[in-house]
């Protein structure tokens, strides 16, 4: 048993998670609804997020000159981000969740041009 444990520990790769962040607008008249939904996230939505190798997921709200924005951050620990995101997008509960949350959001022009809600960001600094 000790030998097997040593082999498992030796074979385990300890790669750091990949960090992702996005930004989108939040409709002022839907902000309360959006906050309510996220204060009461459906358990199956959280479970799917975890099944897709996502950890430390957070969404922050910011008011800039009267316009509301959402900033989302997550860490991905899997090996195929696109496949996991496709898995999440195909999940019926997640689709229904997005039908609730998407109308609260206002995509920025770059995301809207691609038919997306969230705009990609580029990491410019990280302190481990």
Would you name each region that the model predicts?
Residues 17-19, 37, 71:
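Short catalytic/metal-binding and nucleic-acid-binding patches
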Residues 1-8:
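Sec-dependent N-terminal signal peptides
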Residues 60-64:
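Short beta-strand micro-motifs enriched in acidic
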Residues 30-55:
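Short amphipathic alpha-helical segments
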Residues 48-55, 75-119:
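An amphipathic, aromatic/His-enriched active-site/gating alpha helix that lines ligand/cofactor pockets
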Residues 67-74:
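A generic structural motif
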Residues 19-25:
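Active-site-flanking beta-strand signature of metal-NTP-handling nucleotidyl enzymes
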């Amino acid at each position: 048993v000790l030998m097997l444990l040593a082999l498992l520990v030796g074979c385990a790769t300890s790669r750091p998670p990949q960090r992702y962040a996005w930004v989108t607008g939040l409709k002022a008249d839907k902000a309360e609804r959006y906050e309510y939904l996220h204060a009461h996230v459906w358990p199956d939505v959280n479970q799917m997020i975890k099944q897709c190798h996502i950890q430390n997921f957070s969404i922050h709200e910011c008011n800039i000159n009267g316009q509301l924005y959402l900033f989302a951050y997550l860490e991905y620990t899997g090996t195929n981000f696109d496949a996991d995101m496709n898995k999440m997008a195909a999940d019926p509960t997640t689709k229904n969740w997005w039908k609730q949350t998407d109308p609260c959001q206002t995509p920025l022009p770059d995301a809207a041009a691609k038919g997306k809600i969230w705009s990609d960001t580029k990491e410019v600094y990280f302190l481990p």
